[in-house]
Structure formats: C-alpha cells, structure tokens
Amino acid sequence: MNKRSPHHAYLVRVQDIIDLSPNLRRLVLHSDELADYPHQFNGAHIKIFLARHGQSTPQLPQFSGHGFNWVEPDNKPIVRTYTIRDYDAKACTISIDFVKHGNSAPASAFAEQAQPGNMLGISSPGGPNPMLKTAARYLFAGDITALPAIESLLATIQTDACGDVVLLLPQVEDLPATLSLPAGMRLHTFYGDLSLVPALVKLVSTFAPLTCDDFAWIAGEATLVKPLRELLRTQWQLPPLRHYAVPYWRQGENEESYHAARHNFIEK
C-alpha cells in the first residue's frame, strides 16, 4: 500500500442522509480511499470542499507547508471547517453532522439539498492531538455546532470521568437520545438562541473552579466562547494547555470574513 502524505484531500460521495433532529442532518460519506484515512479520534477538525455553482465535482487542493495550492485558482471550491462525527475504516465512511439553517450558507445548503451520489472533498484531520486530555474533572460547553464533537468525545471518555456538560441548543428535540454520559458527569441544557449566553456563562461561573489537573473543552459561537475562555483564564487561572476554547463561527459572518479574527482570538 502506498503511504500517503499526512496532508491529503479525498473525493467522497454522499452515501446516506440521516435527519438527527429538526436542526441537525448527518451525511455519511464514502470512498474506497477512506480505508487508508489517517483517523485518530472523532471530533477532529477537517476541511470540506464544495463544488461551485455549475460544477458537479469540486477541485481538490494540493498541500504545501503554506496551506492549499490550487491548480486552477479561479475554480477553487468553497472551503468550510467541520468535525468528524464518526469514522468506519471497514465501511470506508466518514460521518459529518451539519446544522440546518436553509440556503443562507453554502455548507448548510449542500447538506439540506444533498442526494446520494453527490460529491464533495474532505481533508485529512487536524486540530490538537489529543483533542481531549486525561483529567480529574472536565467541563464541556458549546452550542449545536459543537454538539457533534462533544458527543463524540464523551463517547470515548473514561467511565469514571466527572464534571459538567453545558449545552445551548435551539430546541429540546436537538438533544440526542444517543448522548451518553458517565455517572459522574452532570448535564445542563439551555434551549433557545444566543440571548441565553449570559445565563449559561453565569451558571458555569458557579461551578467549582477547574485546576491544573482538570480540562475544559469549549466551542461554538464567538459570543459564547469568549466569556467562557475569559472565565477559565482570568478567574480560574487555568493554563492554556488545560483547555480548548475555539469559536467555530460568529453570527453575521461567513468563514472567509471571520477567518483572520478567529485565528487572532485562538492565538492570543
């Protein structure tokens, strides 16, 4: 078997479409090449490459030390960032969960209009490795965009783990019936929109502060992530190596317009 570069793009086909809730749709993606996919854990970041209008198949990038290279720059695809929900090496499939919000964004539009056989591209996985560090106590917090990663990570956490999971979801039906928590983990749910972020942050501030033996994993909309990261770093004095706090998106912006600000926030 030829050994691939650690950075590789895969052309995949929609194999199955599963509506998980009123606001989440899962696409199961297949390619024989995925038998050799460098998967290490669910919840890892990946790029998806979507064909432009009038195209049936997206152009895939070449990778260099400076990012993507495009053979035809004028025809490069729409690029978005998602997380791996599940990987099955035997079936050669990867599952990605998409938030459904109509045609207002290209990835959501693709997912809502998807048909078996539709093509897209995906990258090799990225992000911290490991994504989740062993800890005495955990804090998970996020909105519906972070839910697939949170559920994936909880599925692999040690059975004696303890801590808190705090979710902001559009409606109660978006809470997965498959969500499984160790007995020592407490679940806190808020149902509604971003106006509930202050109440969510207030709740988290009442928890016993995490220490250097603990770990926090936080993701979602920027106005949710920013105050929680401030709480972790300033009030709780939690070192950067003991938390992951990444804004996946910012209301009113797309991935291109938010890219620089997002990376500046992460790198602070």
Feature locations, PLM:
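Extended, composition-driven regions rather than compact fold-specific motifs
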Residues: 1-268
